[in-house]
Amino acid sequence: MSDLKRSLSEAAAAAFQAAGLSPDFGRVTASDRPDLADFQCNGALAAAKSAKRNPREIAVQVVDVLKADPRLASVEIAGVGFINMRVSTDALSIRANEIAADPRAGAEPLAHPRRVLVDYAGPNVAKPMHVGHLRASIIGESVKRLYRFRGDDVVGDAHFGDWGFQMGLLISAIMEEDAFIRALLERLVEAPREFSKADEDKVMSEFAQRVTLDDLDRLYPAASARQKEDPEFKEKARKATAELQNGRFGYRLLWRHFVNISRVALEREFHALGVDFDLWKGESDVQDLIAPMVRQLEVKGLLVDDQGARIVRVARPGETKKKKLPDGSVVEVESPDPLLVVSSEGSAMYGTTDLATILDRRKSFDPHLILYCVDQRQADHFEQVFRAAYLAGYAEPGSLEHIGFGTMNGSDGKPFKTRAGGVLKLHDLIEMAREKARERLREAGLGAELSQEAFEETAHKVGIAALKFADLQNFRGTSYVFDLDRFTSFEGKTGPYLLYQSVRIKSILRKAAEQKVVSGAIIVGEPAERDLTLLLDAFEGALSEAYDKKAPNFIAEHAYKLAQTFSKFYAACPILSADNDATRASRLALAETTLKQLELALDLLGIEAPERM
């Protein structure tokens, strides 16, 4: 069961081939002029250039073949050789009934599914998520859902930031503030010989009582700022980090407490966003792989000493860029920069952990493709890591891809901040969206018949839909301006508008059930029925483009057009008050099919629609 665009492309390809030309010229697209045609093929122009022939002559040959296609009511040539096609109402009726009967609403599964890992969100221990995590979380979640829906075997990994210097900062700050914990940690440099599970539980209980998430939230920013001004404290934190990574027993227990309480809070926020992960693997999970990996890189001849540090050169011969030196002179240097694997102090670096993570993923999951949903400002870093991984044989060339995204900006065009100039916490952003959704629902007179609990649940869904759709309607690589008033409107291209149309269709279906009207065979006749069927048929094309470009905006665009087109259909074609049973049954089936496809699209965007408003 192919969508019309694909099946007509196949027919046009055969027609070009029959004319002695490449079938590649037979690409059919939706018409730029829906008033003239449903589909168009511009291949005659490209074919004419290639074959040095008249384009209209070629178009005539192709049209002569296509005219025999029973699905086409008309095939005409426009201008110098554009081919316009109008689909027959019978063919549209057949296609509408196919989509209605299909649980996937016209979406085809992949012929050759792959194993795919999506690395997204990147939350950190002891750091509350902020608005910068919004895009990584919701774009990554949508890409994961899309790939899984298409048929790939997909794993979503949060790639938890649970290692590194921030841990040493926190340990040092807590030891300074809490004498009891300091004394406890000083006793637990190594695991005591007789240290039972009960003893360990007792220590963890002490940590739970004395160190809360609020404490981490308070201590980390202060410690981070202090280490910039206080070299002694910075050195203490570095030492604590090294001892933690070398296995100091008490530090490991306290670190585990940091991870536990941070993850509980993070899972709560991700749940509110409708985001979930198959894996919560952290940077700490690959630490044991780093030393043998470094030795392996050395054996492969990839590690190079550079002023006491150890690097992997990833630039190819001749790849250079101009660099301005402090004295003002300009020199040519290799580009991309080498990947720093081991610092001059002997520490493994951020890129080293990423490289070890690729190695770990290959061993545990062996994915055909790993997608990294991370801010596009990290593009250079990923280019270095990916090239190093390919050189080392840790991944097949082309199997690692950075799907970068732009920033969410304030009205000044700069990354969004609070009025005080700070970074807005994600929790606070979600609550702002909920509050604005409550206000919008009351303004529109919606939700008045709901219980308080149901109203709150609906407001949450509306708020999250507003945030997600505002983001996902843009191509991920572009930045956009945050405007909560516009995002939460029930009019225009917004998430709440899509939810309203979904709820509206559900209301129609409930009334139909009350009146005992049952859906039946779809018979396409009216222009609004044609338009709706053609858009339902376009679902597969939208999914295919979103999949190929790792870009959910194509799904968002389709969902919006579908909601708009249904609204026009409903205004032009009465459903329950239609003048005969067959028409009522047909239009009701179109409404059911629209709802099925709309909610499928919303689910792929990570948006949940309420039953009522």
From Swiss-Prot:
Note the Pfam families from the entry: Arg_tRNA_synt_N, DALR_1, tRNA-synt_1d
Q: Where in the cell is it found?
A: Cytoplasm
Q: Which InterPro entries match?
A: aa-tRNA-synth_I_CS, Arg-tRNA-ligase, Arg-tRNA-synth_N, Arg-tRNA-synth_N_sf, ArgRS_core, DALR_anticod-bd, Rossmann-like_a/b/a_fold, tRNAsynth_Ia_anticodon-bd
Identify one Gene Ontology CC term for this UniProt entry: cytoplasm
- Give the EC number(s) under which this enzyme is classified: 6.1.1.19
Q: Where is this motif: 'HIGH' region?
A: 123-133
Record Gene3D superfamilies: Arginyl tRNA synthetase N-terminal domain (3.30.1360.70), HUPs (3.40.50.620), Isoleucyl-tRNA Synthetase, Domain 1 (1.10.730.10)
PROSITE patterns from the entry? AA_TRNA_LIGASE_I
SMART domains for this protein:
Arg_tRNA_synt_N (SM01016), DALR_1 (SM00836)
The record's keywords, sorted A to Z, are: Aminoacyl-tRNA synthetase, ATP-binding, Cytoplasm, Ligase, Nucleotide-binding, Protein biosynthesis
Catalytic activities: tRNA(Arg) + L-arginine + ATP = L-arginyl-tRNA(Arg) + AMP + diphosphate
Q: Which GO terms describe its molecular function?
A: arginine-tRNA ligase activity; ATP binding
Provide the assembly information.
Monomer.
- The protein here is known as Arginine--tRNA ligase
